[in-house]
Structure formats: C-alpha cells, structure tokens
C-alpha cells in the first residue's frame, strides 16, 4: 500500500471518498510523521493531533452515512500561526502573543474546516510574518528538510511561511496555509521544491489573520503540486463581509478548468528582471521555463516593467509603515504578554511589554515605519512610495495589454544556510526582489518547482497574471510542472 504521507490533497480526498482508506488512517499517519519530525525541523509551534483526528472522524461518519463530502474532505493540513484558531494558541511567532487563545476563527480556516480539512497544528513562521528565512521567530528557527549533498549545515526554508514550506516538503503535511505580503508564499515554496500561489489581493478574506501590512497581506495555499493548490484555493477563497477589502466575486472552478495548453497565449519576459550578476543556475532555470512554455504552445514576448528597480525600496517603506500602525495595538492590556515593572505606570507598562515582546526585526520595521510616517518625512517617503506603487501597477497593466502571463524567477538564489544572511538586513531584503512587484500591484502569482541547482537544491519559477486571472496563472504553472517533471525529494535525515 502507498505510504499515506506521500499523498497530496486530491489523492487523499479521492481515496477517502472511494473507501481506499479512512480519513482517520490518514490523520493518524500524518500525526505520527509530525511527531517524528518536529524535534529536527521545528516546523510547528503547536501540534493538535486530537483536532486532526476529530475532523477525520466527522468525514468518516459522513461517508458512512452517505452524506456529501467537501473539497478537502479527509485532508489534514498545517495552519500558519498567523490565522486565528478558536481555542488554539495563535502567536504570530511572537512572545508578545504567547498564550493568546482566540475566541473566534479566521474566515479562511473556517472555510477549510467546512470543506472537510483537519488541523495538524499551528505552523512556525517569521515573527509577525516579517522575514525571508524563518530566523525571526520567537519559537526558534524552522529547518528546511533539504540539505546540500555531503553537508549537514541547516538551510533556511524561506519565509515568512517557512513552517508551511518545511512541513509540506518533508511530507509531514500534504498542504498548508501561507500568507504572502511581499513573497512569503512564493519564496519558501521555491526554496523547498513545492508549489504555492498568492491569489489576487482580496480573493481570500483577511479577517482573523494577524495583520502585517494590510494593503499587501493575502492568504494562499502551499501544496505538493499545482492541482492541489487549485483545490485548496477554491476552499479558501470567497467574499467575506467582515473584510472590507474582500472581493465580492464568485469563486471560479479553477480545478475543473485546469489546462496546460498554452496555444494562443503570450508569455511576457520582463527585461528588467535580468539582473547583473544573476546566479547562473537561476538564469538557466528561467531559460528552461521559457522553452517549456514555448513547447506548450505559447508565444514568448519580451516586455518592459520600467519601474521595477524602485519596487524594493517602495515595499520597504509601505510595508513597515502599515506594520507600525497595525502593531501599535499590542500593549499588554487585554491579551498576550504583559511586562509590569514594580511601581510602573501605564506608559511604562506599554514600553516594557513591547520591548520584551517584539523581536529585533519587528522592532526594526516598526522604527522604519514610524519614521516614514512622522510629520517631517511623510510626504518625502510614504507619499512618494504610494505614487511609485501606482506607477508599478500601471507597468503591469500596460504589459498585460500585450501578454497573458509573465514568467520570472521566484527568488534570486536557492536556499541559503541559516545565519548566512541574518547579520545584514539589507541582504536579506534582497530575497524579495522578484516577488515584491506583483505584491505591490495586488496581482496573482505562483511559484512552481523547476529543477535543482548545482548544489542539489530546488529552484522555483514564478508566473504572474492579470488581476482576477488565477486560472491563467494556474494553467501556465501546470504547463511548467508537466515539463519540468520535478520529482526530487529531500533525503530523509530527521
């Protein structure tokens, strides 16, 4: 019999529906895999084996009774610890929220439970989703299941959704939720050889997700392949009146309309993404992707996104500005950590709580954000950044008059070793160079594994689409997936 932990969403759901195995057997297998891997990978902050089994039991009972099963029936997933889960600790990987038990469920997680999914646990991440390597978590680094051949140095799983990427790549979860503000689904997916999609801004509700940068944050799925991402995204997406930025649009049937035939489609190759000193393996992978989409029938068109060079500085003004505003609410009064020095007044308590609760990277971004929003600098920085953001969005609008999707690398390199870049925040921020532009424009974008580099580590290719055209992104992703035939898995060392 196939090892149940080798199965993805579609295989589990369909196998449970056919009676090949029970949802309880699947949950039991993944619970055991999580327990075995957690000490080495640290992918989870909290594990919830009982919740996975309870959800599985309901699915098995529904099947026995002949009741209809949901899109995710019998699939146990990892939930990024940015999503509020009723009665289960939600921390955003920060000490300031340690022990916080929400009395409500995020819209996205509730939709997944309604579709028949169960929860294996809350996944580790960069603190408040601020980071590209999962080194800023207050609960320890997540370790990638991948290693360079002959080398035991622990590698970064990407970030901020590093717990999600590590768990899916290590086969201890068939899928996981992620959030993407400037690349936090796509970059970790690329680093670990899995697929992940950031949908159009507003496609998935932000209600109940701990906010980082509210005009950028978007939830999405991370899974073994493109089809599994489509299935999970259908379950996650949908209008939510509790989120003022939610799109009041029906959820398309992305899975039923998956089609890798690219005939009649034009694929844009942005010349500004060809950076000086680009990693030769990344450049080769990009050329492979161009050839694969051409083979699938697409016409390749070189395009220009002239304001690309301003995307990173624009992002690192807007995102910290929004973060400094969002994180002002954490004061130790109603929930989470409270640091109350003896004889302290209210303002002293605020300062002590925030000093003890926030990590260095979060403090750095709060300081940057507060600075660019201050009276003397607001127009010089924040207002200018918003103007440039509009120009970047217009670049994409103009490009999509000529082409249907855009192909680019997901990240400028494969996974790096933990500690390799953490001493230099600016070097770490450069990891987002290919992913940030689509985020600023609110466009759907996904990463698909494309092969291995010279060190035997995964590389990802990124497909960017028009707003609301997740179907076009998924279809191009499927065309790449079928031609890349990526089947490499990390050698098990944990």
Curated annotation (Swiss-Prot):
Pfam families: Amidase
Subunit structure: Heterotrimer of A, B and C subunits.
HAMAP family: GatA
Region (Disordered): 140-168
Residue positions of the active site: 80, 160, 184
UniProt catalytic activity: L-glutamyl-tRNA(Gln) + L-glutamine + ATP + H2O = L-glutaminyl-tRNA(Gln) + L-glutamate + ADP + phosphate + H(+)
Protein name: Glutamyl-tRNA(Gln) amidotransferase subunit A
Organism lineage string: Bacteria, Pseudomonadati, Pseudomonadota, Alphaproteobacteria, Sphingomonadales
EC number assigned by the record: 6.3.5.7
Stretch forming the signal peptide: none
GO molecular-function terms, A-Z: ATP binding; glutaminyl-tRNA synthase (glutamine-hydrolyzing) activity
GO cellular component, one term: glutamyl-tRNA(Gln) amidotransferase complex
Assigned keywords, A-Z: ATP-binding, Ligase, Nucleotide-binding, Protein biosynthesis
Function: Allows the formation of correctly charged Gln-tRNA(Gln) through the transamidation of misacylated Glu-tRNA(Gln) in organisms which lack glutaminyl-tRNA synthetase. The reaction takes place in the presence of glutamine and ATP through an activated gamma-phospho-Glu-tRNA(Gln).
Family per record: Belongs to the amidase family. GatA subfamily.
GO biological process, one term: translation
Enzyme class: ligase
């Amino acid at each position: 019999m196939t090892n149940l932990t080798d199965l993805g969403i579609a295989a589990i759901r369909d196998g449970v529906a056919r009676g090949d195995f029970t949802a309880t057997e699947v949950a039991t297998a993944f619970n055991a895999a999580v327990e075995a891997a957690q000490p080495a990978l640290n992918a989870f902050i909290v594990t919830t084996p009982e919740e996975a089994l309870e959800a599985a039991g309901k699915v098995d009972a529904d099947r026995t009774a002949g009741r209809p099963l949901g899109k995710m029936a019998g699939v146990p997933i990892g939930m990024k610890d940015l999503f509020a889960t009723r009665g289960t600790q939600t921390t955003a990987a920060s000490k300031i929220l340690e022990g916080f038990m929400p009395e409500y469920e995020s819209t996205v997680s509730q939709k997944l439970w309604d579709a028949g999914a169960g929860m294996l646990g809350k996944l580790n991440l960069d603190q408040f989703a601020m980071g590209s390597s999962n080194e800023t978590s207050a609960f320890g680094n997540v370790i990638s299941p991948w290693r360079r051949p002959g080398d035991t140095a622990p590698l970064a799983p990407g970030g901020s959704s590093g717990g999600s990427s590590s768990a899916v790549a290590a086969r201890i979860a068939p899928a996981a939720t992620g959030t993407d503000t400037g690349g936090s689904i796509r970059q970790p997916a690329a680093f670990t050889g899995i697929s992940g999609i950031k949908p159009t801004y507003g496609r998935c509700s932000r209600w109940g997700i701990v906010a980082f940068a509210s005009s950028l944050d978007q939830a999405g799925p991370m899974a073994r392949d493109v089809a599994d991402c489509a299935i999970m995204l259908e379950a996650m997406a949908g209008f939510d009146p509790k989120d003022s930025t939610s799109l009041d649009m029906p959820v398309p049937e992305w899975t039923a309309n998956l089609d890798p035939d690219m005939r009649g489609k034009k694929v844009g190759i942005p010349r500004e993404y060809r950076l000086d000193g680009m990693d030769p393996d990344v450049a080769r992978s990009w050329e492979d992707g161009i050839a694969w989409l051409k083979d699938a029938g697409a016409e390749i068109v070189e395009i220009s996104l002239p304001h690309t060079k301003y995307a990173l500085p624009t992002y690192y003004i807007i995102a910290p500005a929004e973060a400094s505003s969002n994180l002002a609410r954490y004061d130790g009064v109603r929930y989470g950590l409270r640091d109350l020095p003896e004889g302290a007044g209210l303002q002293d308590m605020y300062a002590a709580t925030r000093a003890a609760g926030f990590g260095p990277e979060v403090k750095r971004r709060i300081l940057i954000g507060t600075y660019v929003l201050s009276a003397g600098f607001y127009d010089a920085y924040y207002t200018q950044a918003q103007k440039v953001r509009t120009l970047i969005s217009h670049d994409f609008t103009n490009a999509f008059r000529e082409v249907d999707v855009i192909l680019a690398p997901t990240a400028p390199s494969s996974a790096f070793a933990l500690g390799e870049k953490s001493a230099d925040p600016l070097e770490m921020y450069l990891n987002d160079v290919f992913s940030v532009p689509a985020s600023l424009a609110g466009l759907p974008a996904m990463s698909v594994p494309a092969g291995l580099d010279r060190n035997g580590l995964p590389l990802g290719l990124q497909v960017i689409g028009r707003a609301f055209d997740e179907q076009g992104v998924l279809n191009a992703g499927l065309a790449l997936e079928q031609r890349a035939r990526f089947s490499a898995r990390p050698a098990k060392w944990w």
